[in-house]
Every structure is written in structure tokens, then in C-alpha cells.
Amino acid sequence: MTNIRKTHPLLKIINSSFVDLPAPSSLSSWWNFGSLLGVCLAVQILTGLFLAMHYTSDTATAFNSVTHICRDVNYGWLLRYLHANGASMFFICLYLHVGRGLYYGSYTYSETWNVGILLLFAVMATAFMGYVLPWGQMSFWGATVITNLLSAIPYIGTDLVQWIWGGFSVDKATLTRFFAFHFLLPFIVAALVMVHLLFLHETGSNNPTGIPSDPDMIPFHPYYTIKDILGFLIMLTALSALVLFSPDLLGDPDNYIPANPLNTPPHIKPEWYFLFAYAILRSIPNKLGGVLALVMSILILALAPILHMSKQRSMMFRPLSQCLFWLLVAVLFTLTWIGGQPVEHPYIIIGQTASVLYFLIILVLMPATSIMENYLLKW
């Protein structure tokens, strides 16, 4: 008798995706982050759903409703901090997942890669709108500053900003619509994840060597299921430690002050996971130029398949490209640090140097190094 998991219309889809899926035998721990992102999304949707049961999206009561969740709802504090720090874990896994894709040349699966970029934008939009909901000082001013960037778009900019605000400033209408979109977007993200996996399973996974692994495949279950479960345990332990020992470590103390349109915080800055892009935005004195650089700092990932000049797919056997890759990582850490600093000397010039280096490495140095490595292969 044939196993039901191979014949049932629904179970056979799950079976071909998670059980009998042929996978390369050499996948390292860098391939764990896809499944970790799935767990992060599940945690965020579940905690978010329970938070939404107690939250009110009204300027008069939003801040107090979050306080009520933390003080009066059973384990409300746990839900709130799991959700807030879960977002940080989500972005840590996201950036590591993207970094893995860049290092091992996974971007050559262009459909999977492009859906991944769409996912990154969708998650960033979701996180930004979620940050506005507690209606603290940094929520309000962050929303004001970031939405105001759209006014740099020629001709339609001002109208567009007022249309998004639902008025002439960030107010009740803005908060209500941000809550609506923040609730909706994770489900769109979940749908995009399905498309991402669909495209991935069309080609099969890449592997650390970048060499086709068709002759040497193993079933996903039990080898990679047990490996993924170990990853889940490590990540959930880290998240639990963060939530239970220092839940406010990654947050901004200004967000414990209720939003006040008449009082601007001394340093307006987004959550830590947007600081690198914020630093690139601030490094350009022109408003429109800054906005374009901000968008391009993420959209540049879409150029990765075009900029790939090497005859080898992975960086595993390309030491010069490896050096550049880790220099890029160092530049990103520098940008993240600068994004959290005030706009004054020497931070301005450091930020501008790091921003130039960021684009220079990706657009010029990496392709040039790849071409040079191709010549070295002939020797």
C-alpha cells in the first residue's frame, strides 16, 4: 500500500516540500536561517494576534492600551516583549540569510532572489508600521520623519504624504491605517514565503561549494529536519534570554514617553535594524538624493545577479572576494553605529565615507575582483 503522505492531495505537497525533498548533502548551518525565518514569522503572527485583541488604535488610548497589556493582561508583558524582540530576531535572521545568499552565490536563482527582495521590503514596511503603534515619542517622530521623505518625490510628493497621513500631520487617521496595514502585511508576507519556496523547489537548493549537487542528494527528513529543530532551539533560547533578562536592550527609552507633537526628541532614530539605511540617507545633504540612496541601499541586491562576473558561483574558493565581502560586513556595522549617533563631527564624515564604500564595494570592487580572479584561474 502506498503511504498516505504520497497520495493525499494536501499531504503530498507538504511531503514534497519538507519530507521527501532531495537536498544537497553538504548544507552548512548557514542554510538554517530560512526555516528560522519561518519560525520568526509564526511567532510574530501569533503574538501579534493576541496583542491586537487588547490594543486600541486611537491616539488618545494607544499608549495606555500598551501599558494595560503589560500591567493587567495575563502574560501581556511576555507577549509584548516577545513581539518587540521577535522583530529583532527576525531581522538578525533576515540579514544573515541575505548575507549567506550573497556569499554563496544563491542570487543566481533570480526568481527566488527577487521574491526574497520583495519579502525584505514587505517585512521592513511591516516593522516600520509596527514601531508607530505604541504611540510613544519615537513612534510619532519616526513616523513623521520617515513618511515625510516621500515629499522629496517631485510634483506629487506633498500630496502623497498628506494622502498617507490622512490629514496635514501624523494623527489619529495615520495610526488607524498603520494598524490596519500592520495587521494585513504579515499575511501577505506569508503568501510571498510560499512563492519564495515554490521558486526554490523548482531549482533545488544551492550548496556551499556552488557546484551542482545532483549526484549527491539526501532526503530532507530526517537529516535537515533535526538540524532545523536544533536551530529553532538555539534561536528560541536566545530570544527567551533577551525577553526575560533585558527586554528593553534593543528598544529606545524615548518610546516610554507618550507621543507629543510639540516636543521633538533630541535624536530621532529608527530601530537598530534600519540604522544602516538611515545612516546612508543622512550622509547625503540633498533630500531627494538621500531618499534615492536609501531605496538603492536595499534595491542594489536586485543587481547582484547582473554584477556576478566570476566563473565560480560561490565565494568558497575565492579568497580575494571573501576579503571584500567581510569588508562590506564591517562597513554595514559601521553604518549601523553611525545611524545611532548625532549629526556632528566626526560622525558625518565617517558616515559619508562608509556610504561611499558600501556602494563602491558592491558596484565596482566586487565585479572587478571577480574578473581578476577569473584571470588568476588560468595561471
Curated annotation (Swiss-Prot):
It is found in: Mitochondrion inner membrane. The keyword Membrane applies. Pfam families: Cytochrom_B_C (PF00032), Cytochrome_B (PF00033). GO terms for cellular component: mitochondrial inner membrane; respiratory chain complex III. InterPro entries: Cyt_b/b6_C (IPR005798), Cyt_b/b6_C_sf (IPR036150), Cyt_b/b6_N (IPR005797), Cytb/b6-like_sf (IPR027387), Cytochrome_b (IPR030689), Cytochrome_b_C_euk/bac (IPR048260), Cytochrome_b_N_euk/bac (IPR048259), Di-haem_cyt_TM (IPR016174). The keyword Heme applies. Binds 2 heme b groups non-covalently. One of its GO terms (molecular function) is metal ion binding. Keywords: Electron transport, Heme, Iron, Membrane, Metal-binding, Mitochondrion, Mitochondrion inner membrane, Respiratory chain, Transmembrane, Transmembrane helix, Transport, Ubiquinone. It is a multi-pass membrane protein. Its cofactor is heme b. A ubiquinone binds at H201. Component of the ubiquinol-cytochrome c reductase complex (complex III or cytochrome b-c1 complex) that is part of the mitochondrial respiratory chain. The b-c1 complex mediates electron transfer from ubiquinol to cytochrome c. Contributes to the generation of a proton gradient across the mitochondrial membrane that is then used for ATP synthesis. Belongs to the cytochrome b family. Heme 1 (or BL or b562) is low-potential and absorbs at about 562 nm, and heme 2 (or BH or b566) is high-potential and absorbs at about 566 nm. This is Cytochrome b. The gene is MT-CYB.
